[in-house]
Amino acid sequence: MKKVIVSLVILFQVSITNSLTSQNDMPVLKGPYLGRTPPGNRSQIFAPGFVSTQFGELNSVFTADGKEFYFSRRGIPGKPSAIMVTKMINNEWTKPSPVNFSGTYNDVDLFLTPDGKSMIYCSGRIINEGNMARMNNDFWISGRIGDLWGEPTRFAEEAVSEFEDYFPIVTKSGNLYFNSQRGGPGTNDIYCSKFLNGKYTAAEKLPAPINSPFREFDAFVSQDEKMIIFSSERPGGFGGSDIYISFKKSDNSWSEPLNLGNDINSASSEFGATISPDGKYFFYTSGKNGSEDIFWVSAKIIVEISPKEKKYSPIIKSK
C-alpha cells in the first residue's frame, strides 16, 4: 500500500512539474499578430505552442486595433471549454488565460461586435425558467467594462431553441446568423433571425444551396450579408467537414458554394472560419495536425478562388 501511495505522489509531482514546465517554456511573443510572419497563399498553424497547443483551439478573433486576440480552448481534462484572451502590452503578448466570466461552464463560439464593446458567445450555463432550471447551449452577451467583461445576460431569446445553437454572428443590420440542431439529434443547419423593430424574429433556415441534407455549421457572414463562409459535410469534399464560400446574387439568392480547396481543407475536419478585422487574413480551425489547431492564410485566396466575385474584394484587403 505504501508503494502505491509513493507512486501516486511521484506521478502527481511529475504532472505538476510538466504543467509548470509547459507554462514556463511558453514562447515570448512580441509585435503585431503575435509576432508571426504573415502567411502567403499557403496556410500555416497560428502561434504554435502559445495559442495552438495539444488541446483544441477554435473560434479566433482579433480586436479591431489588433491588440487583443480571443479564441476558445477545449479538451483540457477536468475543465470546461473556455474563452481565452491574450493581450499585447508594451509590445509583448500576455500568456493566454480565460476571460473573467469564463471557466465554470462550457463557453465557445465567440463573436466580437465591430466596435469591440460587446461579446456574444455560446454557453452551457444554467438558465432559470420559472420553477425550472436547464443547461443548454444558448447565446449570451457581455459588455466591455474597461479591461474586463460584464455579467453574462441572455441574447436573442426569441431566436434560440431548446436544441443546441452555436456560432452566433451579428451583421451591420443586426441580423443574427447561427447554426442549430433544432432539426433533431445529429442534424445541423444554418439559420438567420432578422432584427426588426428592436426584436429578433423566429429564426428561419437558409435555403439551398447553403443548407443541404448534410450538416452545415459555423457560418461567417460578411457585415453586408453578401458573402458567407461555412463548413459542410456534403459529398465532394476532402473528408470530414470542409469550408465553402458563397456569394449573394442580384436576385438575393446564394451562389453555388465553392470548396476552398485542399490547402485549407483536408481529410480531417475544418471549421470556425473568420476574417481578421483588417480584412487581410483568413483564420480557421483544422484537425489536420492531429489536434484542433488554429491556422491562418492570406485572405486573397477568397478573391482568387472566385475571380468573378471581384466586386466583393473591398471586403478583403490584400495589401
Q: Can you say where each PLM-predicted feature lies in the sequence?
A:
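Bacterial Sec-dependent N-terminal signal peptides
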Residues: 1-25
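Short, conserved micro-motifs composed of acidic
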Residues: 23-319
